[in-house]
Swiss-Prot record:
GO terms for molecular function: cadmium ion transmembrane transporter activity; manganese ion transmembrane transporter activity; metal ion binding; symporter activity. It is found in: Cell inner membrane. NCBIfam families: nramp, Nramp_1, PRK00701.1. Residues 40-51, 119-125, 176-196, 259-276, 345-350, 407-413 are periplasmic. The gene is mntH. One of its GO terms (biological process) is iron ion transmembrane transport. One of its GO terms (cellular component) is plasma membrane. The chain crosses the membrane at residues 20-39, 52-71, 96-118, 126-145, 156-175, 197-220, 239-258, 277-297, 328-344, 351-370, 388-406. H(+)-stimulated, divalent metal cation uptake system. Coiled coil: none annotated. It comes from Salmonella schwarzengrund (strain CVM19633). This is Divalent metal cation transporter MntH. Keywords: Cell inner membrane, Cell membrane, Ion transport, Membrane, Symport, Transmembrane, Transmembrane helix, Transport. The keyword Transport applies. It comes from the Bacteria.
Amino acid sequence: MTDNRVENSSGRAARKLRLALMGPAFIAAIGYIDPGNFATNIQAGASFGYQLLWVVVWANLMAMLIQILSAKLGIATGKNLAEQIRDHYPRPVVWFYWVQAEIIAMATDLAEFIGAAIGFKLILGVSLLQGAVLTGIATFLILMLQRRGQKPLEKVIGGLLLFVAAAYIVELFFSQPDMAQLGKGMVIPALPNPEAVFLAAGVLGATIMPHVIYLHSSLTQHLHGGTRQQRYSATKWDVAIAMTIAGFVNLAMMATAAAAFHFSGHTGIADLDQAYLTLEPLLSHAAATVFGLSLVAAGLSSTVVGTLAGQVVMQGFVRFHIPLWVRRTITMLPSFIVILMGLDPTRILVMSQVLLSFGIALALVPLLIFTSNATLMGELVNTRRVKQIGWIIVVLVVALNIWLLVGTVMGLS
Protein backbone atom coordinates (compact mmCIF):
# COMPACT_ATOMS: atom_id res chain seq x y z
CA MET A 1 0.00 0.00 0.00
CA THR A 2 2.83 2.37 0.92
CA ASP A 3 4.61 1.56 -2.33
CA ASN A 4 1.43 2.41 -4.28
CA ARG A 5 1.11 5.75 -2.49
CA VAL A 6 4.73 6.60 -3.22
CA GLU A 7 4.27 5.57 -6.86
CA ASN A 8 1.10 7.65 -7.22
CA SER A 9 2.78 10.62 -5.55
CA SER A 10 5.82 10.45 -7.86
CA GLY A 11 3.50 10.10 -10.87
CA ARG A 12 1.58 13.22 -9.83
CA ALA A 13 4.84 15.09 -9.29
CA ALA A 14 6.07 14.12 -12.76
CA ARG A 15 2.79 15.28 -14.34
CA LYS A 16 2.92 18.53 -12.37
CA LEU A 17 6.50 19.17 -13.52
CA ARG A 18 5.58 18.33 -17.12
CA LEU A 19 2.72 20.82 -17.00
CA ALA A 20 4.87 23.51 -15.33
CA LEU A 21 7.58 23.19 -18.00
CA MET A 22 5.17 23.21 -20.94
CA GLY A 23 5.31 26.32 -23.11
CA PRO A 24 8.71 26.93 -24.74
CA ALA A 25 8.00 24.50 -27.57
CA PHE A 26 4.72 26.27 -28.33
CA ILE A 27 6.67 29.49 -28.92
CA ALA A 28 9.12 27.62 -31.17
CA ALA A 29 6.31 25.79 -33.00
CA ILE A 30 4.83 29.10 -34.19
CA GLY A 31 7.86 29.44 -36.48
CA TYR A 32 6.63 26.35 -38.32
CA ILE A 33 3.24 27.79 -39.28
CA ASP A 34 4.23 31.29 -40.38
CA PRO A 35 2.88 32.97 -43.57
CA GLY A 36 5.75 31.45 -45.57
CA ASN A 37 4.28 28.03 -44.80
CA PHE A 38 0.83 29.26 -45.84
CA ALA A 39 2.13 30.35 -49.25
CA THR A 40 4.19 27.19 -49.88
CA ASN A 41 1.58 24.69 -48.66
CA ILE A 42 -1.24 26.34 -50.59
CA GLN A 43 0.79 26.33 -53.80
CA ALA A 44 1.79 22.68 -53.29
CA GLY A 45 -1.79 21.57 -52.54
CA ALA A 46 -3.28 23.53 -55.44
CA SER A 47 -0.69 22.22 -57.90
CA PHE A 48 -0.39 18.57 -56.85
CA GLY A 49 -3.37 17.75 -54.68
CA TYR A 50 -2.49 15.36 -51.86
CA GLN A 51 0.70 14.04 -53.48
CA LEU A 52 3.15 16.13 -51.41
CA LEU A 53 1.58 15.58 -47.98
CA TRP A 54 4.30 13.03 -47.17
CA VAL A 55 6.86 15.84 -47.41
CA VAL A 56 5.05 17.70 -44.62
CA VAL A 57 5.04 14.55 -42.46
CA TRP A 58 8.78 13.95 -42.85
CA ALA A 59 9.68 17.64 -42.55
CA ASN A 60 7.73 17.82 -39.30
CA LEU A 61 9.46 14.73 -37.88
CA MET A 62 12.85 16.26 -38.74
CA ALA A 63 11.84 19.58 -37.19
CA MET A 64 10.69 17.76 -34.04
CA LEU A 65 14.12 16.17 -33.58
CA ILE A 66 15.90 19.47 -34.26
CA GLN A 67 13.80 21.32 -31.66
CA ILE A 68 14.38 18.57 -29.09
CA LEU A 69 18.15 18.93 -29.62
CA SER A 70 17.94 22.72 -29.30
CA ALA A 71 15.88 22.51 -26.11
CA LYS A 72 18.22 19.82 -24.73
CA LEU A 73 21.26 22.05 -25.26
CA GLY A 74 19.73 24.77 -23.11
CA ILE A 75 18.74 22.32 -20.36
CA ALA A 76 22.09 20.48 -20.25
CA THR A 77 24.44 23.46 -20.42
CA GLY A 78 22.47 26.43 -19.12
CA LYS A 79 23.52 28.30 -22.27
CA ASN A 80 21.78 28.81 -25.60
CA LEU A 81 23.18 27.94 -29.03
CA ALA A 82 24.41 31.47 -29.76
CA GLU A 83 26.28 31.58 -26.44
CA GLN A 84 27.89 28.19 -27.09
CA ILE A 85 29.09 29.35 -30.51
CA ARG A 86 30.49 32.52 -28.89
CA ASP A 87 32.34 30.48 -26.26
CA HIS A 88 33.82 27.86 -28.61
CA TYR A 89 34.49 29.60 -31.95
CA PRO A 90 37.03 32.32 -32.94
CA ARG A 91 35.79 35.91 -32.80
CA PRO A 92 35.63 36.44 -36.62
CA VAL A 93 33.47 33.31 -36.91
CA VAL A 94 31.23 34.52 -34.09
CA TRP A 95 30.75 37.92 -35.76
CA PHE A 96 29.96 36.20 -39.07
CA TYR A 97 27.39 34.02 -37.28
CA TRP A 98 25.84 37.04 -35.60
CA VAL A 99 25.49 39.04 -38.85
CA GLN A 100 23.97 36.13 -40.81
CA ALA A 101 21.63 35.27 -37.92
CA GLU A 102 20.43 38.90 -37.72
CA ILE A 103 19.86 39.00 -41.50
CA ILE A 104 17.91 35.74 -41.35
CA ALA A 105 15.85 36.95 -38.37
CA MET A 106 14.96 40.13 -40.30
CA ALA A 107 14.14 38.17 -43.47
CA THR A 108 11.91 35.89 -41.44
CA ASP A 109 10.24 38.83 -39.76
CA LEU A 110 9.67 40.48 -43.15
CA ALA A 111 7.68 37.46 -44.34
CA GLU A 112 5.74 37.14 -41.10
CA PHE A 113 4.94 40.85 -40.76
CA ILE A 114 3.76 41.16 -44.36
CA GLY A 115 1.75 37.94 -43.97
CA ALA A 116 -0.15 39.39 -41.00
CA ALA A 117 -0.66 42.67 -42.90
CA ILE A 118 -2.13 40.70 -45.84
CA GLY A 119 -4.45 38.94 -43.37
CA PHE A 120 -5.73 42.26 -41.99
CA LYS A 121 -6.17 43.55 -45.54
CA LEU A 122 -8.25 40.51 -46.52
CA ILE A 123 -10.59 40.34 -43.53
CA LEU A 124 -11.02 44.10 -42.90
CA GLY A 125 -10.83 45.40 -46.46
CA VAL A 126 -8.11 47.90 -45.55
CA SER A 127 -5.02 48.73 -47.62
CA LEU A 128 -1.83 46.71 -47.17
CA LEU A 129 -0.19 49.74 -45.53
CA GLN A 130 -3.05 50.07 -43.03
CA GLY A 131 -2.78 46.32 -42.39
CA ALA A 132 0.93 46.81 -41.65
CA VAL A 133 0.14 49.58 -39.14
CA LEU A 134 -2.38 47.30 -37.38
CA THR A 135 0.22 44.51 -37.35
CA GLY A 136 2.79 46.83 -35.78
CA ILE A 137 0.39 47.95 -33.04
CA ALA A 138 -0.72 44.39 -32.29
CA THR A 139 2.83 43.04 -32.03
CA PHE A 140 3.85 45.87 -29.68
CA LEU A 141 0.92 44.96 -27.42
CA ILE A 142 1.85 41.25 -27.40
CA LEU A 143 5.53 42.01 -26.73
CA MET A 144 4.54 44.10 -23.69
CA LEU A 145 3.64 40.80 -22.00
CA GLN A 146 7.36 39.98 -21.86
CA ARG A 147 7.65 42.47 -18.99
CA ARG A 148 5.64 40.03 -16.86
CA GLY A 149 7.95 37.13 -17.65
CA GLN A 150 8.03 34.28 -20.14
CA LYS A 151 4.87 32.43 -19.01
CA PRO A 152 2.26 35.05 -20.05
CA LEU A 153 3.87 35.26 -23.49
CA GLU A 154 3.89 31.45 -23.76
CA LYS A 155 0.17 31.38 -22.95
CA VAL A 156 -0.76 34.02 -25.54
CA ILE A 157 1.37 32.52 -28.31
CA GLY A 158 0.24 29.01 -27.40
CA GLY A 159 -3.35 30.27 -27.60
CA LEU A 160 -2.73 31.70 -31.07
CA LEU A 161 -1.21 28.36 -32.16
CA LEU A 162 -4.33 26.55 -30.94
CA PHE A 163 -6.52 29.15 -32.69
CA VAL A 164 -4.80 28.48 -36.03
CA ALA A 165 -5.20 24.73 -35.47
CA ALA A 166 -8.91 25.19 -34.69
CA ALA A 167 -9.31 27.40 -37.77
CA TYR A 168 -7.92 24.64 -39.96
CA ILE A 169 -10.23 22.05 -38.40
CA VAL A 170 -13.02 24.35 -39.61
CA GLU A 171 -11.38 24.68 -43.05
CA LEU A 172 -11.18 20.88 -43.34
CA PHE A 173 -14.89 20.71 -42.51
CA PHE A 174 -15.67 23.25 -45.26
CA SER A 175 -13.39 21.69 -47.89
CA GLN A 176 -14.22 18.03 -47.09
CA PRO A 177 -11.03 16.39 -48.42
CA ASP A 178 -11.00 12.79 -49.62
CA MET A 179 -9.71 11.08 -46.47
CA ALA A 180 -8.51 7.96 -48.30
CA GLN A 181 -6.46 10.02 -50.75
CA LEU A 182 -5.26 12.25 -47.92
CA GLY A 183 -3.99 9.23 -45.99
CA LYS A 184 -2.33 7.84 -49.10
CA GLY A 185 -0.60 11.17 -49.75
CA MET A 186 0.79 11.18 -46.20
CA VAL A 187 2.48 7.77 -46.42
CA ILE A 188 3.34 7.16 -50.09
CA PRO A 189 6.16 9.35 -51.46
CA ALA A 190 5.45 10.84 -54.89
CA LEU A 191 7.33 13.42 -56.97
CA PRO A 192 5.55 13.39 -60.34
CA ASN A 193 7.71 16.01 -62.10
CA PRO A 194 10.57 18.52 -61.53
CA GLU A 195 8.15 21.21 -60.35
CA ALA A 196 7.01 18.83 -57.60
CA VAL A 197 10.63 18.34 -56.51
CA PHE A 198 11.04 22.11 -56.40
CA LEU A 199 7.87 22.56 -54.33
CA ALA A 200 8.90 19.71 -52.01
CA ALA A 201 12.19 21.51 -51.38
CA GLY A 202 10.18 24.68 -50.75
CA VAL A 203 7.95 22.93 -48.21
CA LEU A 204 11.00 21.63 -46.35
CA GLY A 205 12.75 25.00 -46.58
CA ALA A 206 9.68 26.77 -45.20
CA THR A 207 9.33 24.23 -42.38
CA ILE A 208 12.76 24.11 -40.74
CA MET A 209 13.47 27.62 -39.44
CA PRO A 210 16.95 28.61 -38.23
CA HIS A 211 15.80 31.42 -35.94
CA VAL A 212 13.72 29.11 -33.73
CA ILE A 213 16.70 26.74 -33.40
CA TYR A 214 18.55 29.58 -31.66
CA LEU A 215 15.46 30.67 -29.73
CA HIS A 216 14.38 27.31 -28.29
CA SER A 217 17.72 26.72 -26.54
CA SER A 218 17.30 30.15 -24.92
CA LEU A 219 13.76 29.38 -23.74
CA THR A 220 14.90 26.22 -21.91
CA GLN A 221 18.25 27.35 -20.49
CA HIS A 222 16.69 28.86 -17.36
CA LEU A 223 14.07 26.16 -16.66
CA HIS A 224 13.96 25.03 -13.02
CA GLY A 225 12.46 22.11 -11.14
CA GLY A 226 13.39 18.44 -10.97
CA THR A 227 16.63 16.97 -12.26
CA ARG A 228 18.10 17.73 -15.68
CA GLN A 229 16.83 14.35 -16.88
CA GLN A 230 13.31 15.13 -15.61
CA ARG A 231 13.35 18.56 -17.26
CA TYR A 232 14.48 16.95 -20.51
CA SER A 233 11.74 14.32 -20.27
CA ALA A 234 9.12 17.04 -19.70
CA THR A 235 10.54 19.06 -22.60
CA LYS A 236 10.19 16.08 -24.96
CA TRP A 237 6.47 16.03 -24.16
CA ASP A 238 6.29 19.78 -24.73
CA VAL A 239 7.97 19.46 -28.14
CA ALA A 240 5.91 16.41 -29.14
CA ILE A 241 2.59 18.14 -28.41
CA ALA A 242 3.47 21.56 -29.87
CA MET A 243 5.10 20.19 -33.02
CA THR A 244 2.27 17.71 -33.59
CA ILE A 245 -0.16 20.65 -33.58
CA ALA A 246 2.09 22.58 -35.99
CA GLY A 247 2.39 19.50 -38.21
CA PHE A 248 -1.40 19.11 -38.26
CA VAL A 249 -1.79 22.74 -39.32
CA ASN A 250 0.66 22.30 -42.21
CA LEU A 251 -1.06 19.09 -43.33
CA ALA A 252 -4.47 20.78 -43.08
CA MET A 253 -3.26 23.79 -45.11
CA MET A 254 -2.11 21.56 -47.96
CA ALA A 255 -5.13 19.24 -47.77
CA THR A 256 -7.56 22.19 -47.80
CA ALA A 257 -5.80 23.70 -50.81
CA ALA A 258 -5.90 20.31 -52.55
CA ALA A 259 -9.61 19.78 -51.89
CA ALA A 260 -10.69 23.36 -52.60
CA PHE A 261 -8.41 24.30 -55.49
CA HIS A 262 -6.71 21.32 -57.17
CA PHE A 263 -9.82 19.20 -57.68
CA SER A 264 -11.91 22.16 -58.84
CA GLY A 265 -9.42 23.02 -61.59
CA HIS A 266 -7.82 26.02 -59.82
CA THR A 267 -4.30 24.60 -59.93
CA GLY A 268 -2.55 27.93 -60.51
CA ILE A 269 -3.21 29.45 -57.07
CA ALA A 270 0.14 30.95 -56.09
CA ASP A 271 -0.50 33.80 -53.64
CA LEU A 272 -2.46 34.45 -50.46
CA ASP A 273 -4.81 37.10 -51.89
CA GLN A 274 -5.76 34.77 -54.73
CA ALA A 275 -6.34 31.90 -52.29
CA TYR A 276 -8.68 34.04 -50.17
CA LEU A 277 -10.64 35.38 -53.14
CA THR A 278 -10.99 31.90 -54.65
CA LEU A 279 -12.08 30.27 -51.38
CA GLU A 280 -15.14 32.51 -51.04
CA PRO A 281 -17.02 31.40 -54.19
CA LEU A 282 -15.75 27.80 -53.97
CA LEU A 283 -16.58 27.11 -50.31
CA SER A 284 -18.17 30.09 -48.53
CA HIS A 285 -17.55 33.56 -47.15
CA ALA A 286 -17.09 31.97 -43.72
CA ALA A 287 -14.31 29.70 -45.03
CA ALA A 288 -12.50 32.68 -46.56
CA THR A 289 -12.89 34.68 -43.32
CA VAL A 290 -11.51 31.81 -41.22
CA PHE A 291 -8.55 31.62 -43.61
CA GLY A 292 -7.91 35.35 -43.19
CA LEU A 293 -8.16 35.17 -39.39
CA SER A 294 -5.77 32.22 -39.24
CA LEU A 295 -3.30 34.16 -41.39
CA VAL A 296 -3.47 37.13 -39.00
CA ALA A 297 -3.00 34.89 -35.94
CA ALA A 298 -0.06 33.04 -37.51
CA GLY A 299 1.54 36.25 -38.77
CA LEU A 300 1.21 38.15 -35.48
CA SER A 301 2.49 35.31 -33.31
CA SER A 302 5.37 34.42 -35.63
CA THR A 303 6.54 38.03 -35.99
CA VAL A 304 6.64 38.29 -32.18
CA VAL A 305 8.69 35.07 -32.07
CA GLY A 306 11.00 36.50 -34.75
CA THR A 307 11.60 39.60 -32.61
CA LEU A 308 12.43 37.44 -29.58
CA ALA A 309 14.81 35.31 -31.68
CA GLY A 310 16.61 38.43 -32.89
CA GLN A 311 17.11 39.53 -29.30
CA VAL A 312 18.52 36.10 -28.38
CA VAL A 313 21.10 36.04 -31.19
CA MET A 314 22.28 39.58 -30.40
CA GLN A 315 22.68 38.90 -26.68
CA GLY A 316 24.17 35.46 -27.27
CA PHE A 317 26.71 36.28 -29.95
CA VAL A 318 27.91 39.77 -28.98
CA ARG A 319 26.51 40.33 -25.45
CA PHE A 320 24.63 43.41 -26.64
CA HIS A 321 21.10 44.23 -25.56
CA ILE A 322 18.52 46.67 -26.90
CA PRO A 323 14.94 47.04 -25.65
CA LEU A 324 12.43 44.82 -27.46
CA TRP A 325 10.38 47.84 -28.59
CA VAL A 326 13.48 49.33 -30.27
CA ARG A 327 14.19 46.04 -32.06
CA ARG A 328 10.53 45.77 -33.09
CA THR A 329 10.64 49.30 -34.53
CA ILE A 330 13.85 48.66 -36.48
CA THR A 331 12.74 45.29 -37.89
CA MET A 332 9.39 46.74 -39.03
CA LEU A 333 11.09 49.22 -41.35
CA PRO A 334 11.92 46.77 -44.22
CA SER A 335 8.27 45.67 -44.30
CA PHE A 336 7.01 49.25 -44.62
CA ILE A 337 9.63 49.98 -47.30
CA VAL A 338 8.50 46.93 -49.32
CA ILE A 339 4.85 47.99 -49.02
CA LEU A 340 5.49 51.66 -49.85
CA MET A 341 7.54 50.65 -52.91
CA GLY A 342 4.59 48.62 -54.15
CA LEU A 343 6.56 45.36 -54.43
CA ASP A 344 4.68 42.05 -54.80
CA PRO A 345 4.24 40.85 -51.18
CA THR A 346 3.89 37.16 -52.08
CA ARG A 347 7.10 37.28 -54.12
CA ILE A 348 8.82 38.86 -51.12
CA LEU A 349 7.51 35.99 -48.99
CA VAL A 350 9.04 33.42 -51.36
CA MET A 351 12.36 35.29 -51.61
CA SER A 352 12.62 35.48 -47.83
CA GLN A 353 12.19 31.69 -47.62
CA VAL A 354 15.09 31.27 -50.05
CA LEU A 355 17.26 33.57 -47.92
CA LEU A 356 16.46 31.45 -44.88
CA SER A 357 17.96 28.42 -46.61
CA PHE A 358 21.44 29.89 -46.09
CA GLY A 359 21.06 29.80 -42.31
CA ILE A 360 19.68 26.31 -41.74
CA ALA A 361 22.96 24.37 -42.01
CA LEU A 362 24.83 27.13 -40.15
CA ALA A 363 22.54 26.56 -37.16
CA LEU A 364 22.23 22.77 -37.46
CA VAL A 365 25.93 21.88 -37.70
CA PRO A 366 27.06 23.50 -34.40
CA LEU A 367 23.87 22.28 -32.72
CA LEU A 368 24.76 18.69 -33.59
CA ILE A 369 28.42 19.16 -32.64
CA PHE A 370 27.58 20.63 -29.22
CA THR A 371 24.82 18.13 -28.35
CA SER A 372 27.18 15.26 -29.30
CA ASN A 373 29.87 16.54 -26.91
CA ALA A 374 29.79 14.42 -23.74
CA THR A 375 31.82 17.00 -21.77
CA LEU A 376 29.17 19.66 -22.43
CA MET A 377 26.05 17.51 -22.30
CA GLY A 378 26.80 14.90 -19.62
CA GLU A 379 24.10 12.22 -19.49
CA LEU A 380 22.04 14.11 -22.10
CA VAL A 381 24.64 13.65 -24.86
CA ASN A 382 23.28 12.43 -28.20
CA THR A 383 23.19 8.69 -28.78
CA ARG A 384 24.94 7.26 -31.84
CA ARG A 385 21.59 6.83 -33.61
CA VAL A 386 20.56 10.44 -32.96
CA LYS A 387 23.93 11.62 -34.31
CA GLN A 388 23.48 9.56 -37.48
CA ILE A 389 19.91 10.78 -38.05
CA GLY A 390 21.00 14.35 -37.32
CA TRP A 391 23.75 14.34 -39.93
CA ILE A 392 21.44 12.72 -42.49
CA ILE A 393 19.00 15.60 -41.87
CA VAL A 394 21.80 18.14 -42.32
CA VAL A 395 22.86 16.63 -45.66
CA LEU A 396 19.25 16.36 -46.88
CA VAL A 397 18.30 19.89 -45.83
CA VAL A 398 21.42 21.41 -47.38
CA ALA A 399 20.95 19.48 -50.66
CA LEU A 400 17.28 20.42 -50.97
CA ASN A 401 17.91 24.04 -50.11
CA ILE A 402 20.69 24.27 -52.70
CA TRP A 403 18.19 22.85 -55.20
CA LEU A 404 15.63 25.42 -54.10
CA LEU A 405 18.12 28.27 -54.32
CA VAL A 406 19.44 27.28 -57.76
CA GLY A 407 15.92 26.74 -59.07
CA THR A 408 14.78 30.14 -57.83
CA VAL A 409 17.80 31.92 -59.31
CA MET A 410 17.27 30.16 -62.65
CA GLY A 411 13.58 31.06 -62.63
CA LEU A 412 12.27 27.50 -62.48
CA SER A 413 9.62 28.27 -59.91
